[in-house]
Amino acid sequence: MLSLDYNNIFIYELLTERFSSENPSSIDQVVTDFDGVTFHISTPEEKTKILISLSMKCYPELVNYGTLDLLKQIYGAYVHEPEMGYNFSILIDLQQLPATDEEKEQLAMSISMLKRNVLAAPFHRAFTKQAELADLARKDPENAPMLDKQATSQELMAIHYRDEETIVLWPEHDRVTVVFSTKFREETDRIFGKVFLQEFVDARRRPAIQTAPQVLFSYRDPPLEIRDIQGIQKGDDFGFVTFVLFERHFTPQNREDCISHIQVFRNTLHFHIKASKAYMHQRMRKRVADFQKVLNRAKPDVELERKTATGRSFVRA
């Protein structure tokens, strides 16, 4: 199973090339990414100053969960006034780049992960709140169920990151739950989706990966905890995938990787659905071509009309 990259490869390669070039040139390119995200890379003032802007449907929601503070913490002095029509902008001065090639590469990678970092804030907030609830539960174990109930109602975060799809997450004293709602636009997609999701559920039975997050999925109706959220779609073409993350999954050492893996789940799922359909269509076309060859070989030879030199038809006696 393939894993999609967390960063935007086009932005990474473009910035890497510009950081190493001695002769900067003008840029004005619009780059699209998964989930309807749009980037605008331009040099509006000078060739040595690159402006990278991001437009994201759910950005106003994410600001409520601390995204702007997180982005300022990550990008620091590179944060710039947002370009008109975009939500967030970064300005890079090629004359004030880091000294070493390694630092330049890290900067290019960090900027190419802008979409990932924008979506990371709710996860950091949920992990921080979970730690607070865990401390309170250790002091008063009998009150843990009440703490979880309050957290589910007060700390539940919904991210409407696509037109009809939503990410919902909330902390409890011993876990963080993440729910993806996803739409299967075709009946074939729904069938393939069930197969893939069942593999996620069954995978934990293998001894080597029994410590993986628990995965649950359902169709038509969302889980009880999120049924009252405004904007949650439901129906025969909707599925709901739930990840249950325990403390061992988001320790300080692997927290960033956990966030990255969870974020790309939806796109990875649909990528593999489309790849599977393409593979089956390819195999079907090959099988049809093989059948056509067999039929062509089985055709009887057409007996041609023979004529004499004078033009009369020649009939075999």
Swiss-Prot record:
The keyword Iron does not apply. Signal peptide: none annotated. GO terms for molecular function: actin filament binding; structural constituent of cytoskeleton. Gene3D superfamilies: 3.30.1460.20. SUPFAM superfamilies: Arp2/3 complex subunits (SSF69645). Its main location: cytoplasm. It comes from the Eukaryota. Component of the Arp2/3 complex composed of arp2, act2, arc1/p41-ARC, arc2/p34-ARC, arc3/p21-ARC, arc4/p20-ARC and arc5/p16-ARC. Belongs to the ARPC2 family. This is Actin-related protein 2/3 complex subunit 2. It comes from Schizosaccharomyces pombe (strain 972 / ATCC 24843).
